[in-house]
A protein has these predicted regions:
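Intrinsically disordered, low-complexity linker/loop segments enriched in Gly/Pro
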Residues: 147-150, 160
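Conserved NAD(P)+-binding/catalytic subdomain of aldehyde/semialdehyde dehydrogenases
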Residues: 94, 154-175
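Conserved active-site and cofactor/substrate-binding residues in soluble primary-metabolism enzymes
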Residues: 5-8, 19, 23, 51, ...
């Protein structure tokens, strides 16, 4: 995907976060109500307010402003026999990120992975389920509006056992 298209998706997502901030805060309110006895640090990580939305938008703008790392030539050398050797940055492919009660990670981690040309699978904590699923839907809306497939950013609604099984199944042959 061209860098200009990636940046357009990021810009569209920033616009969606801004225009749908009330909806985001309602979804976050459902998360907050589901866990009324959380400690103060958990509360601060989970809570989405206008400032946190502004921070997510700022993060998207910063990622869009960065040079596209995909396909960048890091090193190049031509041997005496004419063989050209090149070290070029390429996407990993698919990245799985498991995180707890920080819904802003749904935006920020996915933005970094997407800009680098990677698909991302997100597995957030159960305490941020409503926030994370809505933020993922907004990601997918930004992708769709720009003619891209939604598979670039997906949310995994898995319990602990299913998550461990996914990791075990995908780790075979690596250890």
């Amino acid at each position: 995907m061209k860098s200009s298209k990636k940046n357009k998706v990021l810009s569209t997502l920033a616009q969606l976060l801004n225009s749908r901030s009330d909806e985001i805060m309602r979804a976050n309110g459902a998360d907050m109500e589901a866990f009324p006895h959380m400690d103060a640090s958990m509360h601060d990580r989970l809570k989405i307010d206008d400032n946190k939305i502004a921070g997510m938008i700022h993060s998207l703008e910063e990622v869009a402003a960065q040079a596209d790392p995909e396909g960048k030539i890091l090193y190049q050398h031509t041997r005496e026999d004419g063989l050209k050797i090149e070290n070029r940055s390429v996407p990993f492919g698919t990245i799985l990120i498991i995180y707890e009660s920080r819904p802003d990670v749904t935006i920020e981690a996915a933005a970094t992975a997407f800009k680098a040309g990677n698909r991302i699978l997100l597995k957030g904590g159960k305490e941020a389920f409503h926030s994370n699923t809505l933020l993922t839907r907004l990601w997918q809306e930004a992708l769709t509006v720009n003619g891209e497939e939604i598979h670039w950013v997906e949310y995994l609604n898995l319990n602990r056992e299913e998550t461990q099984q996914l990791i075990r199944n995908n780790s075979r042959g690596w250890t």
